[in-house]
Regions:
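Domain-level signature for soluble enzymes in the chorismate/prephenate branch of the shikimate pathway
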Residues: 1-218
Length: 218
């Protein structure tokens, strides 16, 4: 099975896909629209994109693109915990406290504020396009006193050592990913991964008036 996902590889989306579809043929796309378009064109059978994060809120681009551009059916979802780890090149494994710069996505750095404030008050934070890109950068600069914040898949992918696990502030943080498909067919999952059925509705109100949403739900 060919599955497209929001890349690059070793991101949390990749981790979610790997967990749910360990034997799938995976294709990373640079943007959410590119991933959804690949499903619509038949380039891949399924697409996995983020829809909502417990801390950051809804991913509006996913919602808007599915509503206005490619109204593909949602055939499944993956709810993945967001666990951030501090990782360094093996060269710095035993003196990671000497790190002077921390690389990661801005959201990941914000999610680890307490740990960073305690251990790296004087460190410089460098924002990258993704946590995976941060891990890749650290792996390519082995002799610089730098570290990355990313998931364990990124550490494995780029040969980094995790020196502190679960440095995120809140354990309840998770991201909800949706699985889209061109055909509205039931998605077969392993029984251990099946958690029941869910229906997603798109509702357009005829006009803006007080109590309109209540009328729909009641």
């Amino acid at each position: 099975m060919k599955i497209g996902y929001l890349g690059p590889k070793a991101t949390f989306t990749d981790l979610a896909v790997t967990t749910m579809f360990p034997l799938a043929e995976k294709y990373a796309y640079d943007t959410i629209p590119e991933c959804i378009d690949a499903v619509s064109s038949g380039e891949v059978e399924l697409g996995v994109v983020p829809l909502e994060n417990a801390l950051e809120g809804s991913v509006n681009l996913t919602i808007d693109y599915l509503i206005h551009e490619q109204p593909l059916p949602i055939v499944g979802e993956i709810i993945a915990p967001i666990q951030q780890h501090l990782m360094v090149h093996p060269y710095y494994k035993h003196h990671w406290s000497d790190v002077r710069e921390i690389y990661s996505h801005s959201h990941a750095i914000a999610q680890c504020h307490k740990f960073l404030h305690t251990h790296f008050k004087k460190a410089k934070y460098v924002y990258m396009t993704s946590t995976s890109a941060a891990a890749k950068f650290v792996s390519e600069h082995p002799h610089l006193p730098i570290a990355a914040i990313a998931n364990h898949l990124a550490a494995k992918e780029y040969g980094l050592e995790i020196v502190r696990e679960n440095i995120h502030d809140y354990d309840y943080n998770h991201t909800r990913f949706i699985i889209v498909r061109k055909q509205n067919e039931e998605l077969s999952l392993q029984s251990t991964l099946y958690a029941g059925d869910k229906t997603t509705l798109m509702i357009a109100l005829p006009k803006d008036q007080a109590g309109a949403l209540h009328q729909v739900l009641s």
